[in-house]
Amino acid sequence: MLQPNMPAPNFSGQAVVGKEFETISLSDYKGKWVILAFYPLDFTFVCPTEIIAISDQMEQFAQRNCAVIFCSTDSVYSHLQWTKMDRKVGGIGQLNFPLLADKNMSVSRAFGVLDEEQGNTYRGNFLIDPKGVLRQITVNDDPVGRSVEEALRLLDAFIFHEEHGEVCPANWKPKSKTIVPTPDGSKAYFSSAN
């Protein structure tokens, strides 16, 4: 089972990038933060809301040197057709990140999000650092979508930690107080926070 601080499994596969099919690999993104987001199926109900929400906020991720890749077990042909559908009828339109097609289910299986019985994936979010190490893992059952705000908050927290060495308490947001991870540092935080 994958856990934080483990190397992310490398993968390579066909994706819809813009209006074209391209082969992408995790190694293409070395030196960047990556959110690898799995979703159950194209043409469903919650999935387009997540994909559109993140695509519309892609500039926020790009400013943080973060690439986003969405992945399902659908084919590139299915992905492409979905991008051609208007958002007003359940389509996703033009996206600002790749849609990876995991038709052979190898990527979903490697990341532990494949529902073997159904042949599709759970909603999984994997935050991968610029060295290719898993930093955060979240897996949801199908009915509940992800939060763009929470994805950005987690990304900001890990970037802050990498840059400053301090740790981020519950509900931390940029410019909030952090904790120097020493006995005296934590006392200073707790005395000012409580």
UniProtKB/Swiss-Prot annotation:
Catalyzed reaction equations: a hydroperoxide + [thioredoxin]-dithiol = an alcohol + [thioredoxin]-disulfide + H2O
CDD domains in the record: PRX_Typ2cys (cd03015)
Active site feature: 47
Enzyme class: oxidoreductase
Gene Ontology MF terms: thioredoxin peroxidase activity
Pfam families: 1-cysPrx_C, AhpC-TSA
GO-annotated cellular components: cytosol
SUPFAM superfamilies associated with the record: Thioredoxin-like
GO BP annotations listed: cell redox homeostasis; cellular response to stress; hydrogen peroxide catabolic process; response to oxidative stress
Keyword Disulfide bond annotated: yes
Taxonomy, superkingdom: Eukaryota
InterPro entries, sorted: AhpC/TSA, Peroxiredoxin, Peroxiredoxin_AhpC-typ, Peroxiredoxin_C, Thioredoxin-like_sf, Thioredoxin_domain
Keyword hit for Oxidoreductase: yes
Function: Antioxidant. Could be involved in protection against reactive oxygen species (ROS) generated by metabolic processes and/or protection of the parasite against ROS released by immune effector cells. Thiol-specific peroxidase that catalyzes the reduction of hydrogen peroxide and organic hydroperoxides to water and alcohols, respectively. Plays a role in cell protection against oxidative stress by detoxifying peroxides and as sensor of hydrogen peroxide-mediated signaling events.
Family per similarity comment: Belongs to the peroxiredoxin family. AhpC/Prx1 subfamily.
Self-association and partners: Homodimer; disulfide-linked, upon oxidation.
Official protein name in the record: Thioredoxin peroxidase
